[in-house]
């Protein structure tokens, strides 16, 4: 694993519709520099392949908790890793900020005093339009 940096930060990142070519340049840069990645179960394996082998990668569904406690555990892992000085990515399917503000992650991180940044993902409709070709 990478040596922790002086100040940890959490990046709430959208994986878009699953095509790595549709990630922003910033998203790819941050993903490759991450020390800890917590990802949704449905994030494309092609996107997960961009993560360096030295990075601690965890599928949030494998944290071993029931659905009711899962979000609290995710919050706990994000906060702990950032407080330890790590660069942390919370990688979500599509866009990280649906109607509930990343499942309350922005609010929880702010209340905990953890530095965070949102890196949007391409919406599925935009990805479909970008992939449209003529024959």
Annotate each predicted stretch with a short phrase.
Residues 1-20, 25-122, 126-127:
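Class I S-adenosyl-L-methionine
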Residues 130-135:
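Short, glycine-/small-residue-rich phosphate/pyrophosphate-handling segment
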